[in-house]
Amino acid sequence: FKSVIYPIITVLFLLIIFNFSIIIKDGFSNRVKVKNYQPKQTFQYLTQNDRACFGRATDFCKFGLSEKRIILLGDSQFGSLAYDLRDRVVSNYTFIPIVQPGYFHLEDSQLISTRTNKVINSYNSLRDDINTIINTSENDIIILGGATSLYLYGKRVVGRSLHWDYQFVDKDTLKYSSKSIENDFRKLIQKLSKNNDIILVYPMPEIGTNLQKKKFENMIRVYNYHYSDFLEQNKEVIDFFDGIKSSRLHKVYPYKLFCDKNSNLCSTHDTENFFFFD
């Protein structure tokens, strides 16, 4: 099965590069020469039956007729990968993108509102529906990840608010415990990897700045995103993921494509493309 998994991992690497090259502000392409201009976020383009796949809580999109399935499970970062991934795998697999704003799959934790401390029942309902799919999976490929530092440790871009009014907590105490959340996710990986191949996508850089809204067309040449800032946000989850082991667990490291330890910089753009926006 490795002969199948490794091409999928290669495709993911390529899609991470190209799908995070996104321009969304109308008119910006007239000021900066950008070949990959598009009028809306990538996750809005994948549709079925005249409805976007992103944000569906029921009737999840399903492309292809193969018995072999790829299930993409995550948030808007994964929603941006779904569009091209569908085209690249649908001839050999049934592709099921389950992508929701701020979604991270945990089985034994509760999601609460940090404003009201109330349990988010809609998350539980969505999770139950997803469990009916993945708990019966056998010899599928399940791709997991997203803004994992946020979901596991409440960390996001250095110096910026979270923009997420929720928190995963222990199901019994309804209190946050990083160990409880880690154990939940580790058990999920162990359970799913008994019968499936799991691709775990490590954190992607989040720069915390919209280079278009800030009108950086004159400053873009000198804009720097430091690798040390990325690590301050994500080192904890990287170390945690490094410690998860399974013979059917395969790992993808997007930050290694963009970040250079020696220069302490992560590339945000080249002469023609932005790699990501915020």
Which stretches of residues belong to each language-model region?
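Extracellular/periplasmic envelope-modification machinery, especially enzymes
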Residues: 1-278
